[in-house]
Amino acid sequence: MKLQYESLTIRQAEVADAEQLTTWWNDGAVMAHAGFPNGLGTTEEEVIEGLGDGCMVIEESDRLIGECNYRNVADGVAEIGIKICETDCQNRGVGRKVLSMLIGWLFRNGYSKIVLDTNLTNTRAQRVYESLGFRKVRTNIDSWKDQFGRLQSSVDYELVEKDFVSYIDCPKEE
């Protein structure tokens, strides 16, 4: 899968991307929202082993700026995740466009519902998800522990196609 819109590209992650993915995944500033304030402590070899369908990278003007993923969790239901890892690319609407590209592709390819969760403290992400039409399903208070054993809370979201608000025209697919 390869999707393009303006200067943005979403494509399948490749072995050549593993070094950058490893750097991001080991960066506590990038991974803190996911419960890993010290990073994952993973190796490039482990990242390469984990590359597969649904593991994608985000490029802006041919520069790697983040990653996204999806996985089938039930019949017609995909769970997604996204990280804009390069701080100079955050707060510019890139995530909203990338999510519009990915979600539109998932709906065009047979999915009827998209689900995701985010840390309760990640209000920036919550605003983006809600602007795309996601509906808050549940708040899970003190439901998991981060790397330091601190209790964390999360918010579960879901989106059906009729509620989807895209921020792009249809992207080019290859």
Identify what each model region corresponds to:
Residues 8-23:
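A short beta-loop-alpha structural element at the N-terminal edge
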Residues 21-29, 47:
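Hydrophobic alpha-helical core bundles mediating ligand binding, dimerization, or RNAP-core interactions
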Residues 34-89, 99, 105, 160-163, ...:
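Acetyl-CoA-dependent GNAT
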Residues 53, 152-156:
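Short hydrophobic/aromatic beta-strand or adjacent loop that forms the aromatic wall/cage
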Residues 86-92, 120-121:
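Active-site acidic-Proline motif in GNAT/NAT acetyltransferases
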Residues 91-108, 127-131:
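Conserved acetyl-CoA-binding loop-helix of GNAT-fold acetyltransferases
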Residues 95, 99, 121-125, 142-148:
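Short glycine/proline-centered loop/turn elements that form peptide/ligand docking sites
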Residues 115-118, 135-153:
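Conserved catalytic-core motifs of GNAT/GCN5-like acyltransferases
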